[in-house]
């Protein structure tokens, strides 16, 4: 299946350190090489880069590395296709308008059954289960609320819609409107919140090292969400199966617990450590 990466923080931050480890899993330390994408929220807009080439060798991914774009919310995805051809339109993250806002979504999993959206107002452009599920989510939200509801209401309804969709299979996802970020875990999803006092970190996939003290202030809070941990010397929290977390400004605001289960390594961590 695919892998996810998200960042939510209280100050504009670049995601290059995490992204560089993450993209190595797109064909070097792991086999998620059927395309990559990354979306940066900038005010009300979204700067999105996608390629159907493997993320580790994509010139577009190289551009992202060199650009050092800073954002409050970022979502990235590396694809290992289960449904749909390896094309740009099937590459995550996906974006839709909801209540006059850009919403961005990326999914890891496989839905063997999902709603038919062929006659809906919000229709998929590609042929993935992921985009169809996002379109269903967007349409359900708009049907239930004519105007934008509270964040707590959004979080509650996302849970209800997700429970419908998970009946069709595995549905890990990260979702953001540029103000907050919601993560749901079906199998594997981990997060870490970095805040003062900051220290150093070493990547699992290539031993890259960073000293966060050189790039932060005492007020900064940065939460990273990913399928599997990206660093070897930090403590990551594994989300519970069926759990939801709502992040804003780098803080965990709401959480719904699921069933605690240990990380099931699909080969990613073993391959990364051996690389």
Predicted regions and their residues:
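Conserved beta-strand-loop-short alpha-helix elements that form
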Residues: 2, 103-113, 247
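Cytosolic regulatory regions built on CNB/CRP/Popeye-like sensor folds
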Residues: 43-47, 101-102, 113-122
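Short acidic (Asp/Glu) patches
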Residues: 52-64, 78-101, 117-120
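Glycine-rich phosphate-binding loop plus the immediately following alpha-helix
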Residues: 113-115, 119-144
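Gly/Ser/Thr-rich active-site loops/lids in small-molecule metabolic enzymes
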Residues: 126-129, 187-210
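Catalytic core of PPM/PP2C metal-dependent serine/threonine phosphatase domains
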Residues: 147-187
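A conserved acidic, glycine/proline-rich C-terminal tail/linker
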Residues: 200-244
């Amino acid at each position: 299946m695919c892998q996810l990466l998200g960042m939510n923080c209280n100050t504009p931050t670049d995601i290059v350190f995490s992204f560089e480890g993450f993209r190595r899993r797109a064909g070097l330390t792991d086999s998620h090489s059927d395309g990559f994408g990354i979306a940066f929220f900038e005010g009300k807009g979204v700067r999105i880069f996608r390629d159907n080439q493997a993320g580790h060798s994509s010139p577009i991914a190289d551009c992202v590395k060199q650009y050092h774009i800073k954002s409050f919310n970022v979502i990235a995805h590396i694809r290992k296709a289960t449904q749909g051809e390896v094309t740009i339109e099937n590459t995550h993250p996906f974006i839709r308008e909801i209540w006059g806002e850009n919403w961005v979504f990326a999914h890891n999993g496989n839905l063997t059954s999902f709603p038919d959206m062929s006659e809906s107002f919000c229709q998929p452009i590609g042929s993935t289960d992921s985009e169809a599920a996002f379109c269903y989510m967007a349409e359900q939200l708009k049907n239930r609320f004519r105007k934008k509801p509270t964040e707590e209401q959004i979080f509650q309804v996302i849970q209800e819609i997700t429970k419908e969709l998970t009946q069709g299979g595995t549905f890990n996802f990260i979702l953001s409107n540029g103000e907050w970020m919601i993560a749901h875990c079906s199998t594997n999803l981990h997060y870490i919140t970095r805040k003062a006092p900051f220290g150093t970190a070493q990547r699992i996939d290539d031993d890259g090292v960073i000293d966060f003290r050189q790039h932060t202030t005492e007020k900064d809070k940065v939460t990273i969400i990913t399928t599997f941990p990206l660093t070897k010397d930090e403590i990551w929290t594994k989300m519970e199966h069926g759990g939801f977390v709502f992040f804003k400004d780098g803080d965990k605001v709401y959480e719904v617990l699921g069933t605690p289960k240990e990380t099931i390594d699909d080969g990613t961590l073993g391959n990364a450590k051996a690389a």
